[in-house]
């Protein structure tokens, strides 16, 4: 779930 990390980082 690397996508979530990028989403949070924006």
UniProtKB/Swiss-Prot annotation:
Its EC number is 1.6.5.4. Keywords: FAD, Flavoprotein, NAD, Oxidoreductase, Redox-active center. The keyword NAD applies. It catalyses: 2 monodehydro-L-ascorbate radical + NADH + H(+) = 2 L-ascorbate + NAD(+). FAD binds at residues 5-10. Optimum pH is 8.0-9.0. Signal peptide: none annotated. Its cofactor is FAD. It is an enzyme of class 1 (oxidoreductase). GO terms for molecular function: monodehydroascorbate reductase (NADH) activity. The keyword Cell cycle does not apply. Belongs to the FAD-dependent oxidoreductase family. Catalyzes the conversion of monodehydroascorbate to ascorbate, oxidizing NADH in the process. This is Monodehydroascorbate reductase II.
């Amino acid at each position: 779930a690397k996508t979530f990390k990028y989403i949070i980082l924006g």
